[in-house]
Amino acid sequence: MAMTYTHEANPTAAWLTLTRPTARLGASPTQLAVLAGLILGLGFGLVLVPQGTLGLAHSAFAGLFVAASLIKIGTVALAQTFETKPASLAPRNASLPVYSILVPLYHEAEMAQQIVAALKALSYPRARMEAILVVEADDHATRKALYAARPPRWMRIMTAPDGQPRTKPRACNLALAQAKGDLVVVYDAEDRPHPNQLLEAAKAFADGGPRLGCLQAPLHIPNCQGFFARQFALDYAVQFETLLPALVRAGRPIPLGGTSNHLRSEVLRALGGWDPYNVTEDADLGFRLAYSGYRTALLRLPTYETPTRSFRAWLPQRARWLKGYLQTLLVWTRAPGRLNLQDQIILWMTLGLSVLSALIHAPLMVWLIFQTVFAIMGHPASSWALDLTVLLLGWSTTGVAMWAGARRTGFAVKPADLVLSLAYWPLASLAASKAILQLILRPFHWDKTPHQPEALRTAP
């Protein structure tokens, strides 16, 4: 039996955490004053000139949807110019950089066998790699399951000491303090990275120069069934095969995915590690890299993920993402001069639009349904045709983005997927509402996403 051991993580790893900029500080007095002014202005407007205020809000919402649709088409067009050469791999020899694989785990006993098998399938010299599997102190079931999976010597099981906030980035920082690698990658419990992904990343870092700080592997969802699973897969196809390639092609920062981020360890340490108070530490890190003058590029070899398959699993995960986007927006608008104008636009185009569009999906859909009913009864509202046009524009551009992204991943899009997206979008408003409530009441709470193991997919 391969020997493993539990290494008690060093609490002094706190030096890796950020003091500024960090989500720990919340909203600044200036940000709170601006928000209060907007709310008061809207309230006075509704009391004094309700019709005009509602009309202005309606126009703003419609304009937001049109802008999002045009941006989506623009990113699809730009992504088509992104060069997709076959993956170039580094030779498997003793000159390869040492790789540290960080795997934060919490209540993942069912996934222990799968993640150990997925890491063992990586085609990288064992003498040049290590894996640190971080388990919380009270998570005895996951620790026991990891031992039962018989991990080899190059996999270490680390126990994170009790502490707050209990988040994934905190666990990653504790592991980073013990990591020996020149390069670092983060994987989640449900991840199944392509066996050659580390070799591709090592080659890309060697060729990319010292200012290449990060490589993002695409996250793919294999063809699956079920409403939430398929919509989730198409979300990923749009994100990783249209939006991110377009941003990289334009030379702009990207909001990193929550896993399969490959980084130079010296760069990551110089940046202070991950912000343990940000529940989308990946999105924040993408902008922090750009602010510090580092580039991010994309890999071709993917990581296969397991989608959320039910509303009960989807809602807290999506709410956590949106809460983290809000945290990141607060961090990077606290002192707007940190980012140049172009990167500020990207910040709002990616994270800001995601939150705002999620908030207004359901209200706009309900409003349109009421207008349609009145139109059928012979009393069409003056804005009904405009609202219907806005919806159809958003629907069609989303369909184009879904098709373009899915075509690159091999995911088979069905006409029903596009039709059912009309029922999927309004659910984002529930997630956005929960995100805002949690940002106020439980800003650093990490909603855990449950996972179920799947048979390992053989990478093409």
Language-model-derived ranges and their functions:
Residues K120-G163, A206:
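Acidic donor-binding segment of Leloir-type glycosyltransferases
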Residues S69-R128:
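N-terminal signal-anchor transmembrane helix
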Residues G286-Y304:
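Catalytic donor-sugar/metal-binding loop of nucleotide-sugar-dependent glycosyltransferases
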Residues Y147-L183, P195-V279, A319-L330, Y424:
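Long helical/loop segments within the catalytic core of UDP-sugar-dependent glycosyltransferases
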Residues G43-K72, V76-N93, T350-L441:
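Membrane-embedded multi-pass helical conduit in multi-pass membrane proteins
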Residues P97-S100, E130, R269, D284:
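Cell-envelope/extracellular polymer assembly enzymes that use nucleotide-activated donors
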Residues D188-R192, W274-Y277, L289:
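The conserved acidic donor/metal-binding loop of glycosyltransferases
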Residues V279-L285:
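Acidic donor-binding loop at a coil-to-helix junction in glycosyltransferase catalytic cores
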